[in-house]
Amino acid sequence: MTLAFQLAVFALIATSSILLISVPVVFASPDGWSSNKNVIFSGTSLWIGLVFLVGILNSLIS
């Protein structure tokens, strides 16, 4: 169970880092938002899901 928690935390940190870099780049590009809207929404949905997963796993571990 601890390994699953550690992997979920790592995935959350990796997703946060990717979104931290990619979202401003998409907004700064001339046609970025209209062409990459689905990718940003998918990444944000993944991030929200990982936040809940880490919270659930944390409550099971401690």
From Swiss-Prot:
Record-linked InterPro entries: PSII_PsbZ, PSII_PsbZ_sf
Q: Which organism is it from?
A: Coffea arabica
The name on file for this protein is: Photosystem II reaction center protein Z
- What are the protein's UniProt keywords? Chloroplast, Membrane, Photosynthesis, Photosystem II, Plastid, Reaction center, Thylakoid, Transmembrane, Transmembrane helix
SUPFAM superfamilies linked to this entry = PsbZ-like
Oligomeric state and partners? PSII is composed of 1 copy each of membrane proteins PsbA, PsbB, PsbC, PsbD, PsbE, PsbF, PsbH, PsbI, PsbJ, PsbK, PsbL, PsbM, PsbT, PsbY, PsbZ, Psb30/Ycf12, at least 3 peripheral proteins of the oxygen-evolving complex and a large number of cofactors. It forms dimeric complexes.
Q: How does it sit in the membrane?
A: Multi-pass membrane protein
The biological processes this protein is annotated with in GO are: photosynthesis; photosystem II stabilization
Name the coiled-coil region(s). Answer: none
- A Pfam family that the UniProt record links to this protein: Ycf9
The cysteines joined by S-S bonds are: none
Q: Membrane-spanning regions, if any?
A: 8-28, 41-61
The UniProt similarity line reads: Belongs to the PsbZ family.
Q: Where in the cell is it found?
A: Plastid, Chloroplast thylakoid membrane
Q: What does this protein do?
A: May control the interaction of photosystem II (PSII) cores with the light-harvesting antenna, regulates electron flow through the 2 photosystem reaction centers. PSII is a light-driven water plastoquinone oxidoreductase, using light energy to abstract electrons from H(2)O, generating a proton gradient subsequently used for ATP formation.
Q: Which GO terms describe its cellular component?
A: chloroplast thylakoid membrane; photosystem II reaction center
